């Protein structure tokens, strides 16, 4: 069932983390780890674009998360911390500037790996990034935006699969994807043996649910869900 929009994101993962501050609570620890598991790839991309090898980027990313997940890391971070995306970027910049030597002195594989991450997939995805002069910051934002959209599409697929609407979703999804050559409504409706009008209604509902999930995903990374529209604009700009 679709939850109503409106007052549903007064509490987000990021507000839970910020409210705990440096004290750490089980709920905040879980919320922060979920955020890190979701958005680790943009950090890896940022470190790679800074010129680090795959192996060093893996080590640095894990070392950063080991530091981030320490109980006292968030001491002093105000409860109006804004956007997790911006916080994480500033934090990794400081980490690379101040702690690279210490991290580099650790024996490879000897440190703590706080998160189990798919490095092979990360490297494969990184290799398809354009080999241009795009800055690490811009590539980070682009990877973040793609991560958000991928999560939304995955959730849409899962919801429709659970509702037994796999075939309908497979056709409707074509009308969601940006830059993808979509078949006509008539062709898609014929493939599903439904009317053109019925398909248009299904696509309209899917787009509406897509927007709801997109806002929900974005809001989970904000201290104030009222920032969702601003963050949405920033992420779409990063994809241009």
Predicted regions and their residues:
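Intrinsic, short, N-terminal disordered tails of RNA polymerase sigma-factor systems
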Residues: 1-240
């Amino acid at each position: 069932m679709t939850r109503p929009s409106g007052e549903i994101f007064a509490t987000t993962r990021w507000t839970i983390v910020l409210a705990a501050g440096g004290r750490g609570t089980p709920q905040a620890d879980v919320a922060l780890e979920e955020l890190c598991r979701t958005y680790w790839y943009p950090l890896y991309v940022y470190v790679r674009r800074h010129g680090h090898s795959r192996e060093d980027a893996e080590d640095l990313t894990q070392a950063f998360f080991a530091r981030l997940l320490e109980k006292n890391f968030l001491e002093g971070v105000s409860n109006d911390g804004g956007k997790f995306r911006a916080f994480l970027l500033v934090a990794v910049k400081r980490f690379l500037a101040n702690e690279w030597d210490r991290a580099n002195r650790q024996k490879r594989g000897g440190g703590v790996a706080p998160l189990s991450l798919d490095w092979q997939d990360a490297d494969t995805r990184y290799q398809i990034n354009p080999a241009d002069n795009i800055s690490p910051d811009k590539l980070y934002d682009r990877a973040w935006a793609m991560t958000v959209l991928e999560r939304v599409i995955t959730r849409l697929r899962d919801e429709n699969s659970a509702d037994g609407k796999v075939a309908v979703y497979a056709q409707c999804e074509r009308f969601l994807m940006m830059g993808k050559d979509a078949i006509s409504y008539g062709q898609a409706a014929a493939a599903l043996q439904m009317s053109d009008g019925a398909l248009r209604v299904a696509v309209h509902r899917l787009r509406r649910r897509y927007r709801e999930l997109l806002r929900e995903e974005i809001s989970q990374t904000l201290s104030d869900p009222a920032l969702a529209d601003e963050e949405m604009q920033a992420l779409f700009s990063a994809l241009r």
